Amino acid sequence: MAQGHTTASAILHNFRELIKEPKGLDDAANYLFQGLLDDVVAGIFIEIHHLRKTGNLTALDGVGEENAESAYRICEMPNLDIFGISTAKKPMDCTCPNCDRLVAATRFAPHLEKCMGMGRISSRIASRRLATKEGSSASSTSTSTYLQSGNTGGTDDEDDVDWSSDKRKKKSTQNSRNNGSKKNNGKTF
């Protein structure tokens, strides 16, 4: 950049020297034109050299006229868009890595969750199994004596304590239920 600035100032200095003489006005115009032309040609030469060395020169060439027509050809075949790409929906299937089944892509995540036993329902079932195993291992002797006694009829609810309270709350009336409540119970105002 500094080199271009010194070149321009040198051109102006030499141009002013030539203008001082009216006879050299024609020479001054030629000198100015020649200096500007040399700068432009040198700049273009350096830019093209740089593009060729970096491999970007082919991008400036553009597309030939023969190739231009084929590049913008519109496809008018059925089931294809204007670029020639199929518009039919392709079924996206995935293979489950756990069971090697083909599963639709939209159902892959839920399938994998169930297949690997990591879903909500699976974790609940696993929790029940663990609780059952712990309960059965702790009371294995009582269960075995219960089964050995031949007591297969009835339920084991008979010995359980009822969790419901004997005292039942009275149903509240409609007025007491709405006191202080912001619900309108379907009524419109």
UniProtKB/Swiss-Prot annotation:
GO terms for cellular component: cytoplasm; DUBm complex; nuclear pore; nucleoplasm; SAGA complex. The gene is Sgf11. Residues 128-189 are annotated as: Disordered. The modification Phosphoserine is found at residue 165. Component of some SAGA transcription coactivator-HAT complexes, at least composed of Ada2b, not/nonstop, Pcaf/Gcn5, Sgf11 and Spt3. Within the SAGA complex, Sgf11, e(y)2, and not/nonstop form an additional subcomplex of SAGA called the DUB module (deubiquitination module). Interacts directly with not/nonstop. Interacts with the AMEX complex component xmas-2. Interacts with Cbp80; important for promoter recruitment of Sgf11 that is not associated with the DUB module. It is found in: Nucleus, Nucleoplasm; Cytoplasm. PANTHER family: ATAXIN-7-LIKE PROTEIN 3 (PTHR46367:SF1). Its main location: nucleus. Belongs to the SGF11 family. The long N-terminal helix forms part of the 'assembly lobe' of the SAGA deubiquitination module. It comes from the Eukaryota. A zinc finger (SGF11-type) spans 94-115. Transmembrane segments: none annotated. Keywords: Activator, Chromatin regulator, Cytoplasm, Metal-binding, mRNA transport, Nucleus, Phosphoprotein, Protein transport, Transcription, Transcription regulation, Translocation, Transport, Zinc, Zinc-finger. InterPro entries: SAGA_su_Sgf11, SGF11. This is SAGA-associated factor 11 homolog. Residues 136-145, 175-189 have a biased composition (Low complexity). GO terms for biological process: chromatin organization; mRNA export from nucleus; positive regulation of DNA-templated transcription; protein transport; regulation of transcription by RNA polymerase II. One of its GO terms (molecular function) is zinc ion binding. Component of the transcription regulatory histone acetylation (HAT) complex SAGA, a multiprotein complex that activates transcription by remodeling chromatin and mediating histone acetylation and deubiquitination. Within the SAGA complex, participates in a subcomplex that specifically deubiquitinates histone H2B. The SAGA complex is recruited to specific gene promoters by activators, where it is required for transcription. Required for nuclear receptor-mediated transactivation. Binds independently on SAGA to promoters in an RNA-dependent manner. Pfam families: Sgf11.
